[in-house]
Amino acid sequence: YYWIINTCNCGFIGILIQPMKDLTTKKILFVICGGVSAYKSLETIRLFKKNNAEIKTILTKSAKEFVTPLSIASLSQGKVYDDLFNVENETEMDHIALSRWADVIVVAPATANTISKLSQGSSEDLASTVILASNKQVFLAPAMNVRMWEHPSTKDNLKILKSFGYKFIGPVTGDMACGEYGEGKMSDSYDIFNE
């Protein structure tokens, strides 16, 4: 651990930073779903890249309403995938190739919709199809409104995914974009990275 210290006229400010890890041999498939927390995925990708991980990214259709493929590609220095049926790559079968390529899959933000799809084995888009075809460790960083997080169907879906061996990072309690306060906020980028 080391400290970043800044002094100013208003007093002492210090932040404890954990040492970074060397991820040179790690291949991380990063799945970004459509939620207001999608912007946080940019910082998380930056952390993984700064530590030498190789990254490929899948954007769901709704994720493209919050972040652009260009911003993701520039940070990840890798290809961004968003379509299950891409005419350019028809012979590659991206869903199988991506599931084999990855050492680990990180879904951040993991929306209530995506959590529901994954718990039911749905394969209606590239993200859910790749995860269904994968035997790699899946990490989910949930992000949704507190009422959605507390809904019984979400709780049931979480139990199912835990029984599959999926690991959850968060969510945390805090102020939400909708103006409410409660559990459902996506974990900090450093917490996702350190998991």
List the predicted regions and their residue ranges.
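Cysteine-centered motifs
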Residues: C8-C10
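A cross-family phosphate/adenosyl-ligand binding-site feature
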Residues: I15-F139, V146-E195
